[in-house]
Amino acid sequence: MTPQDFYRTLEEDGFSLSSKQKEQFDTYFKLLVEWNTKINLTAITEENEVYLKHFYDSIAPILQAFLANEPIKLLDIGAGAGFPSLPMKILFPNLEVTIIDSLNKRISFLTLLAQELGLENVHFFHGRAEDFGQDKAFRGQFDVVTARAVARMQVLSELTIPFLKIGGKLIALKAQAADQELEEAKNALCLLFGKVIKNHSYQLPNGDSRFITIVEKKKETPNKYPRKAGLPNKKPL
């Protein structure tokens, strides 16, 4: 998918990018490739692949009408090089984006990236989701939490749902069907008062299958969740 293919496909979906937005995606690509020589951000560095498998894939929830261009508070867990939240932010500038990442070098990259792209209302924090999930400044504060290929739903639910307001939604982007994952996550979702409201499949323009699972938070998360850093992965609920 060349940049021109990317713009054209978005236009067909009703999103006509401004010259500023096109510049932002171009700068994003160039900085990603440049910084990838210093720290491991991605195995995908060829331009056409980045536009398809990072940029297009990241904005899929917008293209599938699961997000609106409103000043909602969005948290991205394990965003790595900023996916999916920063491509979303370029397309929908009204989003207020927060990223938590456990590697300080990635936070340095994201901070510089946001400055170079001229993004406002973006916030970056270094640390573990389990720790921030017990911090009152973050717990129960977000309308949406996104996670792209971070962990199995059984683990992911404990890392994300505590951050949501009641009625808030987890948007999990997956490369494989989540049916088996959701079966395994039934107990975790029950304990965390999360309910699966959508399990959506679609295809990238090259035909690759992708999946989006949306979980709504129904009640306050019990205080003991998330557990200490590392436990959700070692001993899933």
Curated annotation (Swiss-Prot):
Protein name according to UniProt: Ribosomal RNA small subunit methyltransferase G
Keywords per UniProt: Cytoplasm, Methyltransferase, rRNA processing, S-adenosyl-L-methionine, Transferase
Alphabetical list of Gene3D superfamilies matching this protein: Vaccinia Virus protein VP39
Predominant location: cytoplasm
Annotated gene: rsmG
Signal sequence region: none
Function of the molecule: Specifically methylates the N7 position of a guanine in 16S rRNA.
Binding site for S-adenosyl-L-methionine: G78, F83, A129, E130, R148
CDD domains: AdoMet_MTases
GO cellular component: cytosol
Organism: Streptococcus pyogenes serotype M12 (strain MGAS2096)
